[in-house]
Amino acid sequence: MDFSMVAGAAAYNEKSGRITSLSLLFQKVFAQIFPQWRKGNTEECLPYKCSETGALGENYSWQIPINHNDFKILKNNERQLCEVLQNKFGCISTLVSPVQEGNSKSLQVFRKMLTPRIELSVWKDDLTTHAVDAVVNAANEDLLHGGGLALALVKAGGFEIQEESKQFVARYGKVSAGEIAVTGAGRLPCKQIIHAVGPRWMEWDKQGCTGKLQRAIVSILNYVIYKNTHIKTVAIPALSSGIFQFPLNLCTKTIVETIRVSLQGKPMMSNLKEIHLVSNEDPTVAAFKAASEFILGKSELGQETTPSFNAMVVNNLTLQIVQGHIEWQTADVIVNSVNPHDITVGPVAKSILQQAGVEMKSEFLATKAKQFQRSQLVLVTKGFNLFCKYIYHVLWHSEFPKPQILKHAMKECLEKCIEQNITSISFPALGTGNMEIKKETAAEILFDEVLTFAKDHVKHQLTVKFVIFPTDLEIYKAFSSEMAKRSKMLSLNNYSVPQSTREEKRENGLEARSPAINLMGFNVEEMYEAHAWIQRILSLQNHHIIENNHILYLGRKEHDILSQLQKTSSVSITEIISPGRTELEIEGARADLIEVVMNIEDMLCKVQEEMARKKERGLWRSLGQWTIQQQKTQDEMKENIIFLKCPVPPTQELLDQKKQFEKCGLQVLKVEKIDNEVLMAAFQRKKKMMEEKLHRQPVSHRLFQQVPYQFCNVVCRVGFQRMYSTPCDPKYGAGIYFTKNLKNLAEKAKKISAADKLIYVFEAEVLTGFFCQGHPLNIVPPPLSPGAIDGHDSVVDNVSSPETFVIFSGMQAIPQYLWTCTQEYVQSQDYSSGPMRPFAQHPWRGFASGSPVD
């Protein structure tokens, strides 16, 4: 059995088949317990590994397939998903979109000279193949390229990009938001990658987030202009607009404006000639283009160049989704959306009237006076100043249901195309504006009618465009999603679909169309725990229970959030408090249930972090090392209390201890020594006081406690707390429970953790001092005698032969070892030691206002 699988260089001798890496050896052991890890196929998880560099240890990255419905649910809650997986398990995650492939051709949609020497342009293209000297990567602080653009660059350019990034962090530390790091580009067509860290969006700190994004762009420009004068072209993505949740429109405007301010009107000696703003996603391309036009003015490209669009073909009908202005379209027919009593109401009607001219309004009113009936849904006029023959005005009558009007008006417009021999028609996103039809519902109705028309009128050749206003990105996403769904359905029924939508592309063993979760972590345990949690979340039906003692520490703000979640998501949330156990029971429809569960888990992670920080401040104060300056700068500090987890050499004592675990049915996978100088100093101070009180008698016991994985690191960081242990019956008092009987612990673990493959047991030195018989009403140790000032130090289950010890202060225990076990048998391996690996807490992003945990 290997006790040192925290870090190790990956190596494998293919000729002999011999594993020469400690980490691969550990992975082999895990493969015996979790057979799906060996498959490496798209049905389970697809692991790849990066070998160790410096002290950062190994990284694991798995791609977990999910279905399209689950992808939609998770995409709507991507921030919460990523935050929970990072804060709960230490894993970085991103969602792989099922509709990412798009058009593979590079397309320039905007171009403008910023200065006489430097041109800015907007491109729809894949940054992994975009031809420039330097590509900017949207990176995180740790430069762990586990998903999104970062992962795509590593896959295309080679793992040396990740290795070089790890070396950078090992040498210089994390990269703060607004800063950059530069590495080689591997096999990419560019010469360098500039890893820029953008801000994580906080609604309450809009100005601060915008400032950090501006600093990131300025850092990029300073590098390509002043530090590396060989760079002539640079490509920049929409930094922070992905999982960092920076609003897309604000993001692109900030980037373009920062570039303009940094370059225009400032003489400089530089070889830089071109700045490319690049994305392969249509909404981002449209946002970059709109921001550039708004800030820099009209594009200097020819008018014929437009962004690429989604398209599908059914029989003789071509259906397209484009981003643009409905009044600027060129087609036989442009469709208008009007109030029958006032043609000037509504954004679409106003835009069309302004472009078409007052003659159109006069004809509309005249035609309405002659032909109008209360049941009429479509009125036809000439196009006048628009680039069309006719305008079909859809009339929204207030007395009819809006979805019904949309359905019948759409059908009537298409039927008129046959009557008037129309070959092209452009629709706005009918119903999604003032009519307030949900964008998904409107898209479904419009697609239903178009596809029904295509099947019923096979011989009629018609091009239908849905024209989405450039800034209506959510509507564009809804329509694109509907097209992707319909394309898939139609391809199964042998309809004619363009080759670009049928192409089967594979990415890391998965089809590019297949939605998935990219998961990246430092070790196999955290990867397994995160994967197991994801599976539990996705297996929910209409009921779920969250068990977490931090529920007791929810403040008014959190309870207001719970109330709001009940209202907006149509779920019921019930708080259940019983001795030793606190739960939230959530019931509701599956999609709402998953959304609410992730929001609650995210909230509990933040409360847990706030509580841990309070414990840290208490530790510093107990040592007399807490200052006002520390308190002021705490939120700016990347680390507070640092601890080490290190592999343990195979001493005889640990070998004997391992045998005791195995006798109790717990197979040991790994043991790590915990080293926390701050926690140890506080513990030793307490121990010295107790030894003086007991006149040097033995004051401590070596005891054990099982802890859920999500609390293992926080125990190493701030010590044992009642809220971190597994639930137990507080029959000896409301304290922190330990046992010296491994057999009892193992039996309890098998009952409580029957579904968990891994069990985590801390071995601790516990200051038990004077102890007495415990009682359920104890909230502190009883006095040594009735009326005495001094009290006992702990309580036990049986004074004459104690097995269970209860303390009431976390400073009375120090974690020494963490044993990772499984309840299933695994083949034992040789002992080996390895290098130490530093751990620190994950950065906490705080509450929007104040602290509810008082």
UniProtKB/Swiss-Prot annotation:
Macro domains 1 and 2 may be involved in the binding to poly(ADP-ribose). Macro domain 2 is required for recruitment to DNA damage sites. Macro domains 1 and 2 are probably dispensable for the interaction with STAT1 and DTX3L and for STAT1 phosphorylation. GO terms for biological process: cell migration; defense response to virus; DNA damage checkpoint signaling; double-strand break repair; innate immune response; negative regulation of catalytic activity; negative regulation of gene expression; negative regulation of transcription by RNA polymerase II. GO terms for cellular component: cytoplasm; cytosol; membrane; mitochondrion; nucleoplasm; nucleus; protein-containing complex; site of DNA damage. Expressed in lymphocyte-rich tissues, spleen, lymph nodes, peripheral blood lymphocytes and colonic mucosa. Expressed in macrophages. Also expressed in nonhematopoietic tissues such as heart and skeletal muscle. Isoform 2 is the predominant form. Most abundantly expressed in lymphomas with a brisk host inflammatory response. In diffuse large B-cell lymphomas tumors, expressed specifically by malignant B-cells. The gene is PARP9. Pfam families: KH_PARP14_8, Macro. Forms a stable complex with E3 ligase DTX3L; the interaction is required for PARP9 mediated ADP-ribosylation of ubiquitin. Interacts (via PARP catalytic domain) with DTX3L (via N-terminus). Forms a complex with STAT1 and DTX3L independently of IFNB1 or IFNG-mediated STAT1 'Tyr-701' phosphorylation. Forms a complex with STAT1, DTX3L and histone H2B H2BC9/H2BJ; the interaction is likely to induce H2BC9/H2BJ ubiquitination. Interacts (via N-terminus) with STAT1. Interacts with PARP14 in IFNG-stimulated macrophages; the interaction prevents PARP14-mediated STAT1 and STAT6 ADP-riboslylation. Residues 107-296, 306-487 form the Macro domain. It comes from Homo sapiens. Transmembrane segments: none annotated. This is Protein mono-ADP-ribosyltransferase PARP9. Residues 628-850 form the PARP catalytic domain. It is linked to Overexpressed at significantly higher levels in fatal high-risk diffuse large B-cell lymphomas (DLB-CL) compared to cured low-risk tumors. Overexpression in B-cell lymphoma transfectants may promote malignant B-cell migration. May therefore be involved in promoting B-cell migration and dissemination of high-risk DLB-CL tumors. Belongs to the ARTD/PARP family.
